[in-house]
């Protein structure tokens, strides 16, 4: 039996779904850790779908970089970044028991951009520009690494993909009501989009800052390096175009105040952890 739904009802559903009114679906992807991040999230795309799509998208990015001879061109720098990642990855268990077993990948791409990112499931890319132009210390690289890992741990990409699904569902319902057809959804393209194109919200950025300093501290890196990092970023962006990494982040002043508070909170973790890496 075909259920017939009136156009006014379809339009109401489109508005309801498009507005994201599904608060009953909230879940928390991570444990609180010392920094206490525990916001509930709406996740409509399955974790398995998101990770599989991200793996494919990451493979495309790496394949293109390899073709253009821009992949891991500096062996020493690549090793340096991977060693830092290897110290931080075990610390992810504090927030998610499954995370250390993810299929983590870390690569360095030849690019002048001040950027780095981590796709769902632990697919990381650092651009040479951010390390070389800012003359980053290991602790400052760890601050960026922890921040980007935190996006994956909190599944911010999956959360943003879910928001896109909500919007597209609303459009499809609207299309059914108006006869305009449906909007397709390519999850691989979406995984690429939510990592490289769509901006994170300031909430996402603040969560990642806080979790990031804890990951760095637990890995034996001074969490206060996150502050010197953003001071360097501030200096690098004065009078110029805002780097992709900073395009939607909180203001430098707000961020530094928050980082000072949370770096102080996790500093004892750093003092304990650094003994293991002498």
Q: Which residues fall in each region the model found?
A:
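A Zn2+-metalloprotease active-site environment signal
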Residues: 2-12, 17, 21-278
């Amino acid at each position: 039996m075909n259920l017939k739904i009136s156009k006014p009802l379809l339009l109401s559903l489109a508005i309801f779904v498009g507005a994201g009114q599904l608060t009953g679906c909230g879940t928390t992807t991570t444990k609180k850790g010392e920094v206490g991040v525990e916001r509930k999230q709406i996740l409509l795309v399955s974790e398995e779908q998101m990770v599989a799509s991200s793996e494919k998208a990451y493979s495309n990015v790496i394949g293109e970089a390899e073709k253009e001879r821009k992949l891991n061109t500096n062996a020493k720098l690549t090793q340096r970044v991977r060693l830092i990642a290897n110290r931080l990855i075990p610390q992810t268990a504090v927030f998610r028991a499954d995370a250390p077993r993810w299929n983590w990948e870390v690569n360095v791409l030849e690019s002048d951009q001040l950027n780095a990112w981590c796709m769902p499931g632990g697919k990381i890319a650092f651009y040479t520009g951010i390390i070389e132009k800012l003359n980053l210390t290991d602790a400052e690289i760890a601050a960026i690494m922890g921040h980007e890992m935190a996006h994956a741990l909190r599944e911010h990409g999956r959360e943003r993909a879910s928001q896109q699904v909500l919007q597209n569902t609303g459009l499809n319902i609207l299309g059914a009501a108006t006869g305009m057809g449906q909007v397709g959804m390519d999850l691989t393209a979406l995984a690429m989009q939510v990592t490289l194109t769509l901006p994170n919200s300031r909430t996402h950025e603040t969560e990642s800052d806080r979790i990031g300093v804890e990951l760095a501290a637990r890995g034996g890196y001074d969490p206060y390096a996150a502050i010197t990092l953003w001071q360097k970023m501030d200096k690098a962006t004065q009078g110029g175009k805002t780097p992709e990494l900073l395009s939607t982040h909180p203001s430098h002043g707000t961020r530094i105040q928050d980082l000072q508070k949370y770096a102080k909170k996790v500093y004892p973790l750093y003092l304990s952890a650094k003994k293991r890496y002498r």
